[in-house]
Amino acid sequence: ICFRCGLYFLVSCTFSNQPYISPDSVERNTAYNTRYVANILGGKEFNVGDNNVIALNLKLSTTGGRYLTPIDLEASAAAGRTIYDESQAYTQLQDAYFRMDVRLSYRMELGASTMEFSLDLQNVTNNQNVFTQSYNPRTGGITTEYQQGFFPVPTFRWTF
């Protein structure tokens, strides 16, 4: 890879196991025991004229799925709100989290200041990553809430 050519990359990966012993002496997962986290970042900068740069960047992120506590449907229906089955705390494994972000930017060097226009396309694949689940008293079922889907973020930055 030619870093002087405006290329960069970074790869990181972490493996872990984070159980705990519950008050009933059972080893359980925590909500955040995702078992692994991996990131890949890369990008390329292209010089345009003497003082301008166009950059294209990519970020891939994944983690093992989160553990949730199952909802007790009968108890939830009787109470009219979400009641969790605490005897099964953090036993329900969700799908792995995945997100891909793309960023395109144009930077102008203006003597003592810099102007940058960029467009971040967050979760460009619109992957539906589970955030939480709750009881819905209207339907009598479980509603799944997801993390942010595709989200474009235009930015203007002037540094002086």
What are these regions (language model features)?
Residues 14-15, 28-32, 75-77, 90-93, ...:
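N-terminal start-of-chain detector that recognizes signal peptides
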Residues 1-66:
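Gram-negative outer-membrane beta-barrel transporters
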Residues 60-81, 97-101, 106-160:
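C-terminal beta-signal and adjacent terminal beta-strands/loops
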Residues 35, 41, 87, 103, ...:
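Intrinsic disorder/low-complexity detector
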